[in-house]
Amino acid sequence: MTDTKALKSAIKNSGVSFTYLADTLGITRGALYKKLENVTEFKASEIVTLKNVLNLSNGQRDEIFFNEKVE
């Protein structure tokens, strides 16, 4: 399960808009919001794109997308 709180923080800190992210991922803003609310999951290719666009380290990526403990 995605740590959406950490992901939203990373998005905010990057200064990238949700519209830009959705366009870059090739999905609608609605689909992005569903992923940000853990209604649907991010695909592996989307995680790679987010890592690059948001300038995440491998550790940050792992904490956001692959951490077992999510509050």
Where do the language-model regions lie?
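DNA major-groove recognition helix of helix-turn-helix/homeodomain DNA-binding modules
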Residues: 45-60
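Helix-turn-helix DNA-binding elements, focusing on the entry/boundary residues of the two helices
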Residues: 18, 29, 47
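Short alpha-helical "recognition helix" segments of helix-turn-helix
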Residues: 20-22
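Recognition helix of helix-turn-helix/homeodomain-like DNA-binding domains
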Residues: 27-42
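Short, charged recognition helix plus adjacent turn
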Residues: 6-10, 14-15, 59-71
